[in-house]
Amino acid sequence: MGAMSPWHWAIVALVVVILFGSKKLPDAARGLGRSLRIFKSEVKEMQNDNSTPAPTAQSAPPPQSAPAELPVADTTTAPVTPPAPVQPQSQHTEPKSA
């Protein structure tokens, strides 16, 4: 009773065709295949990276002489003063006394 019968699969397939349309299904399947292929190659590459031993310190090239110091640009700037805040003008006018 818990397993999917062929009728269940047919209904699921019909719903998928109705939702995505028969024209988009081949493109979706192609994209899914490409994604799986890329995923498999990345997993395989990660496994190969883990299986190769890390290079030892003895095989590292000898250190080169210290690089010459580069001139440092002057990063100081003049202080910037912020503009004065603008006071909002009143929209209504008070009646003038006579």
Swiss-Prot record:
Q: Where is this region: Disordered?
A: 43-98
- One GO MF term: protein transmembrane transporter activity
Decide whether keyword DNA damage is in the record. no
Keywords on record: Cell membrane, Membrane, Protein transport, Translocation, Transmembrane, Transmembrane helix, Transport
Per UniProt, the ranges with Low complexity bias are 66-79
Q: Where in the cell is it found?
A: Cell membrane
Q: Which InterPro entries match?
A: TatA/B/E, TatA/E
TM region positions: 1-21
Record GO biological process: protein transport by the Tat complex
GO CC annotation: TAT protein transport complex
The protein's matches in Pfam families, at most eight in alphabetical order, are given as: TatA_B_E
Q: How does it sit in the membrane?
A: Single-pass membrane protein
Q: What does this protein do?
A: Part of the twin-arginine translocation (Tat) system that transports large folded proteins containing a characteristic twin-arginine motif in their signal peptide across membranes. TatA could form the protein-conducting channel of the Tat system.
Concerning its family, UniProt says: Belongs to the TatA/E family.
Subunit composition and interactions: The Tat system comprises two distinct complexes: a TatABC complex, containing multiple copies of TatA, TatB and TatC subunits, and a separate TatA complex, containing only TatA subunits. Substrates initially bind to the TatABC complex, which probably triggers association of the separate TatA complex to form the active translocon.
Name the UniProt record assigns to this protein: Sec-independent protein translocase protein TatA
Q: Which organism is it from?
A: Rhodococcus erythropolis
Lineage start = Bacteria, Bacillati, Actinomycetota, Actinomycetes, Mycobacteriales
